[in-house]
Amino acid sequence: MSLNPRDVVIVDFGRTPMGRSKGGMHRNTRAEDMSAHLISKLLERNNKVDPAEVEDVIWGCVNQTLEQGWNIARMASLLTQIPHTSAAQTVSRLCGSSMSALHTAAQAIMTNNGDVFVIGGVEHMGHVSMMHGVDPNPHMSLHAAKASGMMGLTAEMLGKMHGITREQQDAFGLRSHQLAHKATLEGKFKDEIIPMQGYDENGFLRVFDYDETIRPDTTLESLAALKPAFNPKGGTVTAGTSSQITDGASCMIVMSAQRAQDLGIQPLAVIRSMAVAGVDPAIMGYGPVPATQKALKRAGLSISDIDFFELNEAFAAQALPVLKDLKVLDKMNEKVNLHGGAIALGHPFGCSGARISGTLLNVMKQNGGTFGVSTMCIGLGQGIATVFERV
């Protein structure tokens, strides 16, 4: 494949094991320490990359307060081998934060404003809860439906609009756990999980190299027994068909194709296009549809050209309508989230965009795909998408 000098390539990807937010492996690890460990280990793994060449560390994080405040990108960077001469910024696009971090780095590379970037994101939802310090504007209900800030209810709405049944959602939730468990047993996550020290359920310090969030004993019967989590009267969305509240971080090294060539690095993939889109906040989960359509148009591709998709599983009631309208629902088992998704692995807000993109690249590498799309919905009505081509 012929690459242009300013094409944006992904050199490597790594993530922490996903930990439960309540009493999980990361309960005694701060968000910036988790991030710094990941950055350091990924740079060690890629010793052709000089940390002094890093132009900017761009880190996604949603709730930027407490240990995640005061520009956590810089806080984490200062704890690594990256010198003080490199810059750092923290970005938030809610759920899409670390994919936005990737896009920001890509746009800088494309416009000759840097060659080497470290991007990623973190959310320690056990230490900084999603609602900590949130103060919604009381006038918002004049501009959007009152429940638009309640993500579970927007998923209920989207599922109802598209005729998604409780049974379909339960089957999707089961699939996520089964595929994530299968991927774990087969070593499919080995290249992406950077082992970390953490504490087990008995309080002992140990090294974790697997996700503690996956529930291999999940069954359709156990899912069917769960009560609706958001709408007690007639609701269909449950805790078992929603993304888990977890702690985690993800990281990528990205650079210009020219710099990768100069360093003798074989990249994983090249970014072919990027897009963001807005939708009605009341159906925020629909955002991946227009975002993906935009990105495909910019890449000159059609949906049938895409070999694999990673769609963030915010809710089964949200994911299924998206797959339906992208015309890939009937190909889900061959193309979509082949290693499970956020229902099994969790959705640490600032982490997820880079996480699903990196998992996609590994799926493409393991299965020989050429084109892939990572996409996700974003609270309050947005979508974000990235089209990758394997190099």
From Swiss-Prot:
Keywords: Acyltransferase, Cytoplasm, Fatty acid metabolism, Lipid degradation, Lipid metabolism, Transferase. One of its GO terms (biological process) is phenylacetate catabolic process. It is an enzyme of class 2 (transferase). InterPro entries: FadA (IPR012805), Thiolase (IPR002155), Thiolase-like (IPR016039), Thiolase-like_sf_Thiolase (IPR050215), Thiolase_acyl_enz_int_AS (IPR020615), Thiolase_AS (IPR020610), Thiolase_C (IPR020617), Thiolase_CS (IPR020613). It holds the Pfam family Thiolase_N. Coiled coil: none annotated. One of its GO terms (cellular component) is cytoplasm. One of its GO terms (molecular function) is acetyl-CoA C-acyltransferase activity. Its EC number is 2.3.1.16. Heterotetramer of two alpha chains (FadB) and two beta chains (FadA). This is 3-ketoacyl-CoA thiolase. The gene is fadA.
